[in-house]
Structure formats: structure tokens, C-alpha cells
Amino acid sequence: MEIKQMLVPVSRYSVLCPYEMNPTEITFHNTYNDAPAINERNNVANNSTGTSFHIAVDDKEAIQLIPFNRNAWHAGDGTNGRGNRHSIGVEICYSQSGGARYRKAELNAVEVIAQLMIQFDIPISKVKTHQERNGKYCPHRMLDEGRVQWFKNQCANRASSIKNSNKTQETGKVEIIVNKFNKVVTYEFGTALVPEMLGMMDALGYESRIISYGDKQGLVRFETAYRQGNELDKATAWLDAKGLKYFYTKE
């Protein structure tokens, strides 16, 4: 996903990002409002409190406002805390009311965080919530819905997928991994099933992800790399029980 640069003026660095930084971690947040990314960027650029973060992600775009080689004040763990001094802060928009816009913002954040993990060689163990930094109840919507681990799994799976894709492009060869070469792609289904579906896939150990929200509001498409054998029957039986239609592909 493209990260649009709209950096704050250098004159604001002394307040918003006074220290140089070599990012080794990532912290993700919910904004707790229903404003788009551009509003979040502008609020930080003009505030006098010093509160800041690196990227705001909504359902349409990701905007970077602080350079990745500067710190930002988003983690609440003090002047020398790892969150404030060593992590890239990612704010996910539209979390107050939720709905389709928020779900899409979440999926966009997965893409952004996965890209950052690869760019800065950050392992998933260093991708943390605001709550893990200083105890604040954030990201509030993910915590309310019990989906923090699901979100982290999505980031890890997406980063792995991008790495494998890059490796294939570099070598010019298609690498076939035993037990992971068949994909199953669902047709469109409602967002209400997303946490349950991906939770089930995670429990079975599959690499899976949402691939599209489709043309209809609130409808998504999903793919997973299935292993062959008895586990395949368990997963497809679950899809069948939910009345979800799917097809197999090796592409």
C-alpha cells in the first residue's frame, strides 16, 4: 500500500519529534474518533501538546506525518520509553463507530505494518499495542472485540506473504512449499464472520487473509493456503456449515 508523505514542517520537530530514531519496533493504536487520516495528520501538525505519531491509516489512504528516523510521542511510556523512542506509531482511524470504514482501515493498517516490518526488519514480537506500552486501553475497539492477537497474526502472515513474493520475483522461480501450494478463495460474505473465520484458520495453523472488500459495501473475500490431508476436511467442513461458497486455485 502506498504511504503518502505529508510531513509536518521542520520547525515543528522540536515539539513533535525532537530525537533521532532507528526504528526497531511498531506500536498500533485506535484513534477513538471517526475522523479520516488527513484530519488526524492536521491535528498533530497544529497541536501544542506535542502528541504525535508517524502514520494515520483510514479506509482509503495511509498518511505519514513524522519521518521514520525521528521519534514521536504516542506511546505514553516516557521520554526514554521504547514506545516513544524506538517504535513507529500507527493510528487506525474510524474506531469510535466502527462499521465497514473501520474494518477497511484495519485491513489497510495490516498492509502498512507488514510493509514496515519488512522495511525495518521488525519481528512480530516487536509489534505491540499502546496498552502493552503503558497500560492505556488502546486500541480500544480491538480490545473490546478481543481481536488484538488476530490483528497481529494478520500482520505477521501478510509480512511473510510479501517476503515470499519478493523472493519469487528476485529468483524468477516459483517456490512450491510442501502442504502450502493449494489456495482456497471464498466468494463474498459479510464482515460479521471475519473474526470467527480467521480465528478458526489461525487455530488450524493456516496462513490466511482478507483479500478484498469487493464492490458491495461490507462484503469481503478471503483466501487461505490450505494443507492437504485431514485438516483440509476440517476447514472446508467449517465453510460448508456456514454456507460459504469457495473455489480452489494454485495461482
UniProtKB/Swiss-Prot annotation:
UniProt cross-references to CDD domains, sorted A to Z: PGRP
Can you cite a GO biological process for this protein? Answer: killing of cells of another organism
User: What's the EC number here?
Assistant: 3.5.1.28
Q: Is Secreted one of the keywords UniProt gives this record?
A: yes
Pfam families, alphabetically? Amidase_2, CBD_PlyG
Q: Where in the cell is it found?
A: Secreted
Q: Name one GO cellular component term.
A: extracellular region
Output the SMART domains linked to this UniProt entry: Ami_2 (SM00644)
The entry's keywords: Antimicrobial, Bacteriolytic enzyme, Cell wall biogenesis/degradation, Competence, Hydrolase, Secreted, Signal, Sporulation
The record's catalysed reaction(s) read:
Hydrolyzes the link between N-acetylmuramoyl residues and L-amino acid residues in certain cell-wall glycopeptides
The molecular function GO annotations come to: N-acetylmuramoyl-L-alanine amidase activity
Q: Where is the N-acetylmuramoyl-L-alanine amidase domain?
A: 38-140
InterPro entries cross-referenced by the UniProt entry: Amidase/PGRP_sf (IPR036505), Amidase_C (IPR021976), Amidase_domain (IPR002502), NAMLAA_amidase_2 (IPR051206)
Q: Where is the signal peptide?
A: 1-37
- Broadest EC class assigned to this enzyme: hydrolase
Query: What more is known?
Result: Retention of enzymatic activity was limited to the N-terminal fragment (AA 1-196).
Family membership noted in the UniProt record: Belongs to the N-acetylmuramoyl-L-alanine amidase 2 family.
What this chain does, per the entry, is described as: Autolysins are involved in some important biological processes such as cell separation, cell-wall turnover, competence for genetic transformation, formation of the flagella and sporulation.
Q: Any idea what this protein is called?
A: N-acetylmuramoyl-L-alanine amidase CwlA
Supply the gene name: cwlA
